[in-house]
Amino acid sequence: TIHQGSLIDTPDGNEWWTIMQQDVGCLGRFPNLQPVKWTDDWPIVGNKGVPYETTNKPVTGAATKRQPLPTNDNFRSYPLGMQWQWNHNPDNSAWSLLERPGWLRLRTSATVSRLTQARNMLTQRIYAFEKSASMGTIRLDVSKLQEGDYAGICIFLDPYSMLAVRVKDRQKQLVWRQDTLRVHDNFTPSERAEAVEIGDVIYLRATIS
């Protein structure tokens, strides 16, 4: 659903638009720009009330260029790009972009029992594409993991799924886990772990559709 927005007109006064929130469930709310037509003094959004998936941009009164994201995901610049956000207030003593240029270094700042308690979880918003999957791929250096440490990738929804490398009994394991953020009826957490030969660097990928 799309709701909770504001009406705006273009500088030339010939077009009306609305910026609204699109509720996509567990993926959150996305800003959504839709054209507006007036019928009998009532604003009609999109195509007779149905939002457009794509449409021409508003007339802004000036030439505009397509603006990609101002930064990329390679961790080669400081500070972090605007597409990143911490899930909690971070422990700034336990992460760095400067100690190893081109890498985000994370240290274990505390031992916790649940993923939701991990402070230095760096996230990006998942985009709800209708016809293609959203995908994230990470490159991890796990050479310095200590007993009990986890490092990996997660689709942080409710329920969530994670794929990680952990050290247990001085051996690296590849772990997949699905669990909930809150108590849900008729849900049983699942976990699979397998001891595998892992070098210093591993690639992990998560996909959601």
What are these model-predicted stretches?
Residues 1-209:
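Carbohydrate-active catalytic/glycan-binding domains of CAZyme proteins
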